[in-house]
Amino acid sequence: PPLNIALPRTANQHGAACLNYMPVTAIERTGGWIQSLTATDKETGESCRIRTRMIFNCTGVWTDSIRRMVDPDAPSIVRCSRGSHILLDRSFLPGDSGMLIPKTRDGRVLFCIPWHGMTIVGTTDVEQREPDWNPQATEEEISFLLETAAGYLAKPVSRADVKASFAGLRPLLRAPEGGSTAKASREHAVIPEFGNMITVAGGK
């Protein structure tokens, strides 16, 4: 099964109580220690208070949102980078092999891969200011992918050939010097903070 299903399933087998669709909505901290958090059931609207001894903040692009429930002035440590992909007909990449374009005009790599009877083309690297539960590929990104892949595909391609598009968000570590997300570190950091919270941030 996919990792996001296998992980809670394995945790449950080891005695964890896995609460899906129950986002944290508040965190209580007194005396330099996180005492509890409040989670709300998205299906019923009911909230519950959970007492805590230790919190692991492994929330990807929502890392800073959780940290600011503890301290509204906590500095940002994560940048959101959007990666978008398009799906084309299989005829644009006949055969069973994928293809890697080593350098695009923005200095990234681009890939074309056979995928479930289609051809997947990706990816972009665009900074997104705020996390989004349902990120979308922009027309600018779709045009970039088409223009970059056009010289390598088996036949001419146009916007009308795009069967679908999708996007995801990367939680990249924020560097003091800034710069483009394409050049941002793909490393991760493990940060003990707020007395009894461990934040795992970054990675890809």
Residue spans of the language-model regions?
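Helical element adjacent to the flavin cofactor pocket in flavoenzyme catalytic cores
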Residues: 1-54
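C-terminal catalytic lobe of FAD-dependent flavoproteins
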Residues: 2, 6, 10, 68-204
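General beta-strand structural signal in soluble alpha/beta enzymes
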Residues: 18-20, 57, 121, 199-200
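Glycine-centered loop/turn positions within well-structured domains
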Residues: 25, 35, 64, 84, ...
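Glycine-rich nucleotide phosphate-binding loop and flanking beta-alpha elements
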Residues: 45, 62-63, 94, 127
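Short hydrophobic core segments
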Residues: 50-60, 149
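Flavin (primarily FAD) binding-site architecture
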Residues: 57-72
